[in-house]
Amino acid sequence: MSDHDTPMESIQNGENSDERLNAIASFFGCSLEQVKSFDGDVVKHLNDKLLQFNELKSENLKVTVSFDELKASSLKKIDGLKTEMENVIRENDKIRKERNDTFVKFESVENEKMKLSSELEFVKRKLDDLTEEKKETQSNQQRTLKILDERLKEIELVRVENNRSNSECKKLRSTIMDLETKQQGYITNDLNSRTELERKTQELTLLQSNNDWLEKELRSKNEQYLSYRQKTDKVILDIRNELNRLRNDFQMERTNNDVLKQKNNELSKSLQEKLLEIKGLSDSLNSEKQEFSAEMSLKQRLVDLLESQLNAVKEELNSIRELNTAKVIADDSKKQTPENEDLLKELQLTKEKLAQCEKECLRLSSITDEADEDNENLSAKSSSDFIFLKKQLIKERRTKEHLQNQIETFIVELEHKVPIINSFKERTDMLENELNNAALLLEHTSNEKNAKVKELNAKNQKLVECENDLQTLTKQRLDLCRQIQYLLITNSVSNDSKGPLRKEEIQFIQNIMQEDDSTITESDSQKVVTERLVEFKNIIQLQEKNAELLKVVRNLADKLESKEKKSKQSLQKIESETVNEAKEAIITLKSEKMDLESRIEELQKELEELKTSVPNEDASYSNVTIKQLTETKRDLESQVQDLQTRISQITRESTENMSLLNKEIQDLYDSKSDISIKLGKEKSSRILAEERFKLLSNTLDLTKAENDQLRKRFDYLQNTILKQDSKTHETLNEYVSCKSKLSIVETELLNLKEEQKLRVHLEKNLKQELNKLSPEKDSLRIMVTQLQTLQKEREDLLEETRKSCQKKIDELEDALSELKKETSQKDHHIKQLEEDNNSNIEWYQNKIEALKKDYESVITSVDSKQTDIEKLQYKVKSLEKEIEEDKIRLHTYNVMDETINDDSLRKELEKSKINLTDAYSQIKEYKDLYETTSQSLQQTNSKLDESFKDFTNQIKNLTDEKTSLEDKISLLKEQMFNLNNELDLQKKGMEKEKADFKKRISILQNNNKEVEAVKSEYESKLSKIQNDLDQQTIYANTAQNNYEQELQKHADVSKTISELREQLHTYKGQVKTLNLSRDQLENALKENEKSWSSQKESLLEQLDLSNSRIEDLSSQNKLLYDQIQIYTAADKEVNNSTNGPGLNNILITLRRERDILDTKVTVAERDAKMLRQKISLMDVELQDARTKLDNSRVEKENHSSIIQQHDDIMEKLNQLNLLRESNITLRNELENNNNKKKELQSELDKLKQNVAPIESELTALKYSMQEKEQELKLAKEEVHRWKKRSQDILEKHEQLSSSDYEKLESEIENLKEELENKERQGAEAEEKFNRLRRQAQERLKTSKLSQDSLTEQVNSLRDAKNVLENSLSEANARIEELQNAKVAQGNNQLEAIRKLQEDAEKASRELQAKLEESTTSYESTINGLNEEITTLKEEIEKQRQIQQQLQATSANEQNDLSNIVESMKKSFEEDKIKFIKEKTQEVNEKILEAQERLNQPSNINMEEIKKKWESEHEQEVSQKIREAEEALKKRIRLPTEEKINKIIERKKEELEKEFEEKVEERIKSMEQSGEIDVVLRKQLEAKVQEKQKELENEYNKKLQEELKDVPHSSHISDDERDKLRAEIESRLREEFNNELQAIKKKSFDEGKQQAMMKTTLLERKLAKMESQLSETKQSAESPPKSVNNVQNPLLGLPRKIEENSNSPFNPLLSGEKLLKLNSKSSSGGFNPFTSPSPNKHLQNDNDKRESLANKTDPPTHLEPSFNIPASRGLISSSSTLSTDTNDEELTSNNPAQKDSSNRNVQSEEDTEKKKEGEPVKRGEAIEEQTKSNKRPIDEVGELKNDEDDTTENINESKKIKTEDEEEKETDKVNDENSI
């Protein structure tokens, strides 16, 4: 190492000497040659002197700069002090006039005092830190002190000047003290004013007592409000219970309704079936009648013409009848389907019932006969009655028959019009939906419109208010200007025409006066006011005008009192009128009640009369109406009682409230009169105080600083108020949102009501339409027969479609079950993949930890080398720029390489994306098909249940909406309750703050005593300040204005408090409105329930009608049966004799029955009309009752307006109380602040004195810091200059010498070492981060513990506070008791009570202060912890982003195998570069070792080492090849032929489903980064290791060759050795670069060749495979099948690859090129030959592979054969899927290439023949069997789903091939191309 260091030192000395000479020459202005002529010692001395001179220069600069800065700072301080003095004098006058307001703000003084003390401590700490830094700088500056001795004298002069300035400052301070002594003299005059103040405090105590009384009343009102709330809560609970009960009833009714509906449906079905039977019978009857009439006519003719042939005709007639009966029976048998058997049974049952009825009729007739026989002896009257009854019976029978016929016709017409009615229903439903949508839109738009109108109105109102405010402000401004004008006049007269204002200000006021246009618009009264009150000559005149003002105000107050009395009287009148109106309303309601009862009795009587005439069917309806009336009656009675009770309560409350309010108003008027008297007194005293105020203007010097502090406090209070306002605004916004939601709900309810009304209306319309459709039934009878035939055909078609649909459904269910099984299997597979991923992640984590350990060990080695780096840093600075240029060049080259690779990656990514989109589109198509089929099925099923479901859904929606509304109401109530609680808490907080303020005032009062001692000193200083009194008058005016402004601010605070209270009252009103809305909703619910009950009754009526129809039909059937029997009997008689009159009798009876039925129908219609009229009358009466109820509700709302007025009055009273409290507090604080003012001023002076030396030290330290910064700047400038100089030298010489190059290399090495140091620092930073994280966690734990302890403390303090509050409340209760006995007891007891109260308040204040301190500390700790947490979270998020980027890069790497191959190439190239860099370092070390051992002969044999490495490498490669072969043998197992044939039998639907499932699996596996990632990473690591070994071998070879040429002697110099090393490294770099470029070119050429060969082969194969399609479809000799539902895994591989008996076979070595082609086709997602569906990405289960490996040996015609020639030329690279014909063409086209390849690689064939013998034989067998068994294309497309799994495994085995072999392949390909 010593030999190596000597040349480096010599080089450095040479460089330093050149630099020295240049510097000396430039300094003295000589040439370099002259300087070089000097001796070395002289040059050294000159250089030392030059350096000293430069140092002196820099120090001189520093000193001058520091001196200038000191000067500037001292001047600034002097100016600042002067300005401060002037400001103090000015603000002295302001503070005197603002005294009343400043006392309120004295509380902030203490806080700021604490702040100042904390700042002082902070400054002291800073001073300590700065002193430490100063010590450090002094240790560094001890060398420069010798040179700075001369300059110290100048600094001392500066210090003298500084001291002089300090002495002047002290003099100024002494003058201030004199002024303060004078001020004390003036304070004595204040004592007189204090006596008056004490008198006023006594008056204030009386006001406080009044305030306490008012507070007591407030509490009582609050208690009443709480009791009212409790009552309302109870009422709400009762209502909820009733709601639950009603819900249960509703559910019960719904269940009953459902049961009735089911029964109704069953009955309607049975009715329809019976009607069909009746139709068939009637048709047969009609046909028989027609035949009978024809036969009778024929018989009559035959009797007249051929009496002799009667017997023959009779025989013929009998035969014809038999034929007719047979025909009828045949027709009936044809009609009787399996479905009509049930109908026949029911007919038989009805016949049996008819028979029973006939028996009963016979029995009754027998009874009547007996009665007739018994009653023969009766008189003629009884017989006449009996005859009359018989006639009525006959009439009734006829009417019955007529009705039955009409009902039959009506039913038939209804059956025909069922589809039309259904279509009408559908249309009505559609129209209803459209109407609903339109109504919703209209409501939405109307709501929006209303909202916007409201907003517009509000904004207009605001604009009007703003305009009014502007007008008032302009008036006030004008009045002020006039007053100022007159004041100026008076001042100018008194001060010899020299006023206090400047000319500009006077002009400004005059401009305002000129611009005034209000005189035109002003009224006469306003002009008079301005003349009398604004314009004045003297102060005496102003006082007189003020007295006039007082008189006017008092007169106005009297008028107000009189008006208020009148308003009270009017209110009493209104109350009495309301009570009378309520009584009258009650009386009217009672009378109406009586009327209703009488009407109900009349209706009951009418109902009893109707019962006799009307059948039993109408009884149920009358009962229902009676029940409804009774219920309404009860409701009305209950409502009347409620109204009576409420009215009585309201009257009581109103009278009580009025009495209380009158008392309060009288008390207020009394207090107001007292206050007005006191105001007059105070104004007179104020005039005297103002005269004295001029003398006390100098006292404002002390109060200036206090004023600033108080202003800060005031700003802080304003901020808190603003925050409270923001909170209130938030609550208001929430309330508004709730209100909007409520309005939306109400609109929805209204919509529902309207929908219900529409539905009822539509039902009525439908009924009317049904009545209108009845006349059309005759026209539609003809179509019945045709429709019946069509119906039968349709039923047959429906049955067929149902059967087909059921078959399809069964098939789909089977397919679904299969899909579910497959999904379960694939879920299991996904879980396995997740477990594998977790294991991989753990492995990576372990690996990262190991790498970290290695990294730490490397860092330790780097630390040892850092000492050498520090020596060479000086050289690095000069050569940094050149290194950066080299880096830029390298970066450009790297960017070029990356862009080439990025383009290829992007293209392949785009292809994969296109394939995925195609796959997704196909999936969507299949899903759409499936959805359409399922929708069609659902539609057929849903149409049957729609009507029933709609009805139930509507009921459910209404109930859900009802529940949601109730929930919303409850939520709103809770929110209101929370808001009230928050307001109470805020009030409590304000009271606490008030107590704190009082406490601070007491402290200030104590401090004020100390200030009085200082007053005596100010008296001596008054003589000097008398000259400044004229100036101070101006300041007094400004201070007065400020005082007025602050008064206005306090008024704003009181306004905000009043606004809060107003909001409270508004909230109460809103609660009431919510209660009203709740009542409305309840009423709406009741109305809905009534409507539902009416609907239910209508349904029951319909049921009764249907039952009556059934009974009529049964009776009609009986009649028909009787007629049939009569007809059969008549036929028998006709056979014997021709009895024509019998038929005529039947017709007559039928006509009579028809007439009877007609009369009955008319009677029934009349009865119905009568009933309808009665119902309409009842509805009118109900509507009248409802209107009366609405009127009563309106009256109730009027009462609520009175309550609101009462609340407004209470709010005004509260505002007055607040004003009184504020006045009291302000006066108390005035007294306290006067005392504390002086103490604070003295403390401020002391603090200023303490701060002054600290500030001087700070400035000195700042100067030292600036000097250091200047030194740094100089150093940077020198570095920049040297860099420029080095650049100039380089530009001149243009070329670098070998020595410069060596220097650059050495500096590069140094930079590398610096990089390593930086990496080590990064590791240390990570460790620090981990430590910080642990510390943060520990702190979090400690903070949580502290938080828990703090919360406990807070709770304990709160408990103590509550105890104190309880004690306070007890004390207040005692005070109230004592106040009741105020007259009896004396003033002594009042004082004792006050003491108690003050003690309690003090205790509460102390607790609150403790609480605030604890909360502040708690909040500070929490904030600190939150900041630490946020920093930690940010760091964690950064790490997560890095991890996500890594994951994204890993996910992008998994897209395609082709991308992975290219990325591997990139990584290999990068590894080469890294390896070169690492090897250069190793070579440097080895060269050094070799140089040391050059004297001795080298014992190491490099060739032996090389052979060992090669043998190890070959062994590793052979092991990997064997492992890959074994894996292939396991996985390349094909199923048997019998099981492969099953795949063709499968449908395309199954394939499509499997495809979709596999696509989903692939997406999941891509997300979870499955097995491919692990395999590829292993392959990459293996490749990198092999490449490193190869590069090491090559590098060592070249080093040995170079070292062999070096002579074995020790006479070689160090320079020569360095040159040798540099030359070797440069050569190696050039060679490596050339190799990299050659590899890039070769890989590019290979890709081109592969693409060309692939396209040509694919075109040929497509043509031939299409020709083979027809043959393969016909000949199904060897159809492929799946093995146990596991598809063939090898169909994605090529079937054959250029077989030749001469060429050796190695499937693993040749498989890589095959993979490069196959990866593009398979990974792209589509089979280019057959299947329309895209192939899946490479993914499969390990279980399936193992099962395939254990199966029987595959058929040879499907086993893949590999044939890659030894040359690895074009054929091996372009090998793809091919058939036998393609193989023959390839072998014929490329014989020359194969021969050349066989010649070139003879040696490799000998070594690999043993391994490849078996695969070659297998390949020959494949050739023979593929000729006989050719595969169809469909088979390939179907089996392509699983072939990618095996290609993945083959890729794993084939990627073992090293980069060396690829390079050899490319060389041989180039040779063959050249041949």
From Swiss-Prot:
Modified residues (N-acetylserine): S2
PTM statement from Swiss-Prot or TrEMBL: May be phosphorylated by CDC28.
Single GO BP term: protein localization to nuclear pore
Subcellular location per the Swiss-Prot or TrEMBL entry: Nucleus; Nucleus, Nuclear pore complex
PROSITE patterns from the UniProt entry: LRR
Basic and acidic residues: compositionally biased ranges: 1738-1748, 1807-1840, 1865-1875
Residue numbers carrying Phosphothreonine: T337
Region ranges (Disordered): 1641-1689, 1716-1875
Comp. bias regions, Low complexity: 1716-1725
Record-linked InterPro entries: Leu-rich_rpt (IPR001611), TPR/MLP1 (IPR012929)
Primary localisation category: nucleus
Alphabetized UniProt keyword annotations: Acetylation, Coiled coil, DNA damage, DNA repair, mRNA transport, Nuclear pore complex, Nucleus, Phosphoprotein, Protein transport, Translocation, Transport
Leftover remarks: Present with 2710 molecules/cell in log phase SD medium.
Record-given protein name: Protein MLP1
